[in-house]
Amino acid sequence: MKIDNILFDKLVVEAQSSPRRRMNFDLRTQADAPAGVGSSEWADQSQRMLNVLMTDTVIPIHRHTETSETVIVCRGKVREEFYDADGNKTAEFLLEAGGNCPGVQVPKGQYHKLVCLEDGSVIFEAKDRAYDPVGTEEFLKIVK
């Protein structure tokens, strides 16, 4: 499979029409376990995906307690922001395809969010574990 501008353009169209204003594309070759094999026994327990974002995409501050996350910008520009448990921004990284810093590694347990700065930005995301929806306790609730 080629990962090229044709694929990116197709995903941008899908993201534009999505209520969430983003679209992901699973890059795992074996997303589902074969019949008779439990998912915990299945070899590919990672997450590898493209995620296409619009500037009005909302990604709340959250964390992943069981895995780190790698984010690399393939097209466009985003800002990755790190937060402490009190909701204070502790760092931010401007990530730009072809720029000085196209990617960042988000440590396990680090509160963070991504802000899309260019419509149709395409990021590659990788996590160590199989997809598990972030529980409500993993979203940062800021009370001021």
Q: What spans do the regions from the language model cover?
A:
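Conserved short histidine dyad/triad with adjacent acidic residue
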Residues: 49-66
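Short, surface-exposed charged micro-motifs
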Residues: 50, 70, 113-114
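Double-stranded beta-helix
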Residues: 87-94, 98, 111-144
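Glycine- and acidic-residue-biased ligand/ion/polar-headgroup-sensing regions
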Residues: 66-86
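A short, N-terminal "cap"/entry segment at the start of jelly-roll beta-barrel domains
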Residues: 1-45, 91-96
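Short beta-strand His + acidic residue motifs that chelate non-heme Fe in jelly-roll/DSBH
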Residues: 60-62, 80-82, 103-106, 112-117, ...
